[in-house]
Structures are given as C-alpha cells and as structure tokens.
A protein has these predicted regions:
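Active-site cores enriched in adjacent His and Asp/Glu residues with nearby glycine-rich loops
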Residues: 1-32, 55
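Charged, cofactor-coupling segments
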Residues: 21, 29, 34-114
Length: 114
C-alpha cells in the first residue's frame, strides 16, 4: 500500500495504527464446508483453534478501495481485488485445492476472452 502511494509513513507505524483497515476490512479467510461460510469458532475459550487434518478453509487476501475514499488518488477509487485459494489441512501440512485456478492478469484475461 505504501509502494502504491495508498498509504504514507513507516510500515511499522501504519500496521500499529491498523491503517490498512481502510482497504481490508475483514480477516484473511474463513472455514469452508457444507456452506461457503461454514460455521465454527476460531477460538476455543481464550485459545485459537488448532488446525486439524480434514479442516478446509479459504485464504483470500484482497484490497477494496471505496469510491468515496478521498485520501487516495482518483485512479484507485472503486477498485476491489481478491485472490482466493481453498486449502485442506493434511497430516503433513496442507493441500491448496485451487492451486491450478488462474491468478495472474494474463491468465484471467485469457480465460475471460475464451
């Protein structure tokens, strides 16, 4: 965000102030199961839930720039982009089950033109 000029200042200070929240207002992903946004607690009591083999979750970083955000250059306003993967937790680590889905600009444009 700093490199693009959307935020100004030191990265450490911007993170400390949660300045990125203007562009990314939710978490990195969610459970995936019988429903697109499957239910389940992310914490058990005060502890984060330990991932177990067979659990499926999304990893979906993105940027969302409001049309009304006058703190950024006009060329950025109204843009939203997200790259999403679906991941299965395995005994050995994880399996990205959407690894073959197009993600680059060129791949996506070729798919759309087909």
């Amino acid at each position: 965000l700093v490199a693009l000029g959307l935020l100004k200042g030191s990265v450490a200070n911007l993170i400390k102030r949660n300045a990125y929240r203007d562009f990314y207002m939710h978490r990195v992903g969610h459970w995936l199961g019988l429903d697109v946004h499957d239910v389940g607690d992310y914490r058990v009591g005060e502890e984060w839930r330990v991932l177990e083999p067979g659990m499926v979750m999304t990893v979906e970083p993105g940027l969302y720039i409001s049309e009304s955000n006058t703190n950024v250059a006009k060329k950025w306003r109204g843009i939203g982009i997200r790259i999403e993967d679906d991941v299965v937790v395995t005994e050995e680590g994880c399996d990205v089950i959407t690894a073959s889905v197009p993600k680059t600009i060129e791949e996506i444009e070729a798919l759309m033109a087909a």
